[in-house]
Regions:
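Terminal amphipathic alpha-helical/low-complexity segments used for targeting or macromolecular assembly
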Residues: 1-173
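Structural signal for interior beta-strand "rungs" in well-ordered beta-sheet cores
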Residues: 174-208
Length: 208
């Protein structure tokens, strides 16, 4: 019975349109690694709330430096996998150029983190001001699913704006699974944005 199942599942007709053949051994972007990317980005954007909670004003420069270096390495590999997925030429013919492009895009994304933090600060303020039950900005950052979904969206949107394929959708779908809030990375959302509760909210790619 097991052998028959293996044989049937291995027939080309059974996986037509469902099989992705990796180019030059490069895997697809990994949701598990992208989870680490998001956690690292959050630890940089909201220091002390995510990642190392013992961070203080004397050690913040060190911790952010370490996290940014790790973020750059992980993100470069994931962007490379995304570029290989979207490449028509195949990674065997353009691996070096794609790797350089992946590193360039990862560095460009990291350069956007200060801007993202400024915008997310307005989102936290909007959530706090809009909810009379909120006790502090810290509570909003730690507890509100909207901030998790919005931070994923802000990260994914910047990656999409840089032309990174596939990864932005994975990142927003991770937040969708976690919070029930579905924000397409292509949506144009300004500052001071919040969602009260949010379960079942859908914001599409054409939203402005």
């Amino acid at each position: 019975i097991l052998t028959q199942a293996v044989d049937e599942l291995s027939e080309s007709e059974s996986y037509k349109g469902l099989f992705h053949q990796h180019k030059d051994g490069e895997p697809l972007p990994s949701a598990r690694v992208l989870y680490d990317v998001i956690e690292l980005a959050r630890s940089i954007l909201f220091p002390g709330y995510f990642g190392n909670s013992t961070i203080n004003s004397r050690t913040i420069n060190y911790h952010i430096g370490v996290n940014i270096e790790r973020l750059f390495d992980l993100l470069t590999e994931q962007i490379l996998a995304g570029l290989c997925f979207g490449s028509n030429e195949g990674c065997d013919t353009c691996n070096d150029s794609l790797r350089e492009e992946a590193a360039r895009l990862a560095a460009k994304f990291i350069s956007k983190l200060p801007h993202m933090r400024r915008v997310l600060a307005t989102d936290v303020e909007a959530a706090y001001n809009g909810d009379p039950a909120a006790q502090s900005f810290g509570e909003v950052i730690c507890c509100y699913p909207a901030i998790r979904a919005i931070s994923n969206y802000r990260i994914a949107h910047e990656l999409l704006e840089l032309g990174v394929p596939l990864i932005p959708r994975i990142i927003t779908e991770m937040a969708h699974s976690e919070t029930g809030i579905d924000i397409h990375p292509g949506a144009q959302i300004g500052s001071y944005f919040t969602i009260d509760h949010g379960t079942g909210v859908v914001i599409g790619a054409t939203s402005i």
